[in-house]
Amino acid sequence: MALLIPHHDDPEGLYRSLDSVRPDEPCDVLVVDDGSARHPLNVERAAAHCQTQGQLFTLALASNQGIEAALNAGLAWIRERGYEYVARLDCGDRNRPGRIARQLQYLNEHPDVVLVGGRASYVDLAGTEQFVLPLPATHDEIMAYLRNNSAFMHPAVMFRTKVLDQTGVYPTEFPRAEDYALFWEMAKVGRVANIPETLIDYELDPDSLSLSGRRQQLQSRLKIQRRNSDGSRAARRGIARTMILLGTPYQAAVRVKSWLNPRSTP
């Protein structure tokens, strides 16, 4: 099992993430440095923060190519070495204790499931929980939810490497929504699920996604929804919702999420 973490000029966030990979977690860790210039990856310091049962590996891209390229380079490395499972984590986000073992157990008990996610606790930069976003759990619930948005927290997923033989890797034509596109393809070829438990802490940085970046993400989402539309009422409603969000400020959207999802979920 390989835990894939892309990195770009955020060593402190990386160290927080590596600190959360507990000594009892059965995984190797691959950090892909996406051409960091201001804060190049310090392998020795990273290794000091990684206490996993397995090994820490690093892969450096010669230049900054974007998260899709970094993730796909990591997936190529992982597939070449024959890993059966891939889990994701992003710099700054932190595993809850037992996250890796819990998802491995789930996939072993459900051989028809190709992708499994879980809930995330949204925390501020001080680590204080703001809210937990509930997600659909079953395959049918997820297929319905995909009409509106991704049904998975990207840094909280684990999937079978072999599913990539059918879906391909992260697409590059949907910037900032590459995960939404890939996970929809996975849901078409196999069963998918979310464990109804909080598996990670997701760092909510108001400056991490610029206004232009958020617009790009929503525009990509709209393209994915249109590509997968079956003309149903649910599909049309999902497209309309995304178009409304294109005119909604980011902070307002976060406040609505926190109102609808109080901080009480396990």
Please place each PLM-identified region on the residue numbering.
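Short, well-formed alpha-helical segments that are part of the catalytic scaffolds
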Residues: 10-23, 42
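A conserved acidic beta->alpha catalytic loop
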Residues: 33-44, 63, 90
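Glycine-rich, basic loop-to-helix element that forms the pyrophosphate-binding segment
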Residues: 61-81
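Short beta-strand-to-loop acidic/aromatic patch adjacent to the donor-nucleotide binding site
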Residues: 83-94
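Conserved donor NDP-sugar-binding/catalytic core segment of glycosyltransferases
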Residues: 98-130
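Catalytic beta-strand/loop signature of glycosyltransferases that borders the donor
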Residues: 119, 180, 193-199
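Catalytic core of nucleotide-sugar-dependent glycosyltransferases
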Residues: 140-145, 202-205, 211-235
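Acidic donor-binding loop at a coil-to-helix junction in glycosyltransferase catalytic cores
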Residues: 176-182
